[in-house]
């Protein structure tokens, strides 16, 4: 009885941590940068717009992970681990953008908020990396309750998208369709990443320029 109780508590605790990771992602990795993007467009801050434009290109891997996990595709667990690492790197990597941000007056609200957000994103990246790494064991077997916790949010989002898709287009947005779109998007993502690694990085290094 005691062992069963401990197992139930551990299961609930792990599920709570998984949902905390998803909520942090929705806040720090999606919500805040979206607000900052609108803010920077309104204030016409080109350096912040360029930084966030690059960030959103990289962060699309998180959306790809959700599409793959919707249909319980094992590859989704791998991309979920890689995504936060690349997202954190994308906001610190560029030398010219770092210098331009450093030159901004520290008392200005938008540059200050961007600086704070970058550190918050870095903290989220560490938490997300640790948590998603524990989900890699689900690549072999997804029948455990711990693995089900990782699927709840993607499948919940899928049900909402499915309802909207059916209402607007009168078609079916199934789990298989979501996974197919995820695979196509992943191929495009990897092609863009490979092109950057082989062509742009050797030529321009850590300078974002007009990229």
Give names to the regions the model predicted.
Residues 47-56, 209:
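Membrane-interfacial loop-to-transmembrane alpha-helix junctions, especially the N-terminal start
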Residues 77-152:
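Membrane-proximal helix-loop-helix units in multi-pass membrane proteins
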Residues 28-44, 193-197:
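N-terminal signal-anchor/start-transfer transmembrane helix
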């Amino acid at each position: 009885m005691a062992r069963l109780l401990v197992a139930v508590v551990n299961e609930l605790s792990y599920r709570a941590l998984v949902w905390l990771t998803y909520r942090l992602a929705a806040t720090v990795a999606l919500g805040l940068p979206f607000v900052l993007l609108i803010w920077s467009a309104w204030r016409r801050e080109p350096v912040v717009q360029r930084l966030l434009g690059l960030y959103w290109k990289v962060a699309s891997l998180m959306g790809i992970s959700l599409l793959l996990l919707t249909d319980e595709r094992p590859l989704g667990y791998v991309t979920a681990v890689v995504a936060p690492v690349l997202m954190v790197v994308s906001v610190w990597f560029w030398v010219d953008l770092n210098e331009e941000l450093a030159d901004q007056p520290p008392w200005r609200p938008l540059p200050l908020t961007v600086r704070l957000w970058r550190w918050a994103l870095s903290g989220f990246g560490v938490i997300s990396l640790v948590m998603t790494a524990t989900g890699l064991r689900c690549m072999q077997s997804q029948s455990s309750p711990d693995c089900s916790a990782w699927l709840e949010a993607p499948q919940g989002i899928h049900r909402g998208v499915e309802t909207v898709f059916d209402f607007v287009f009168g078609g079916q947005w199934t789990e298989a369709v979501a996974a197919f779109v995820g695979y196509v998007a992943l191929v495009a993502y990897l092609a863009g990443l490979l092109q950057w690694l082989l062509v742009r990085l050797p030529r321009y290094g850590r300078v974002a320029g007009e990229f």
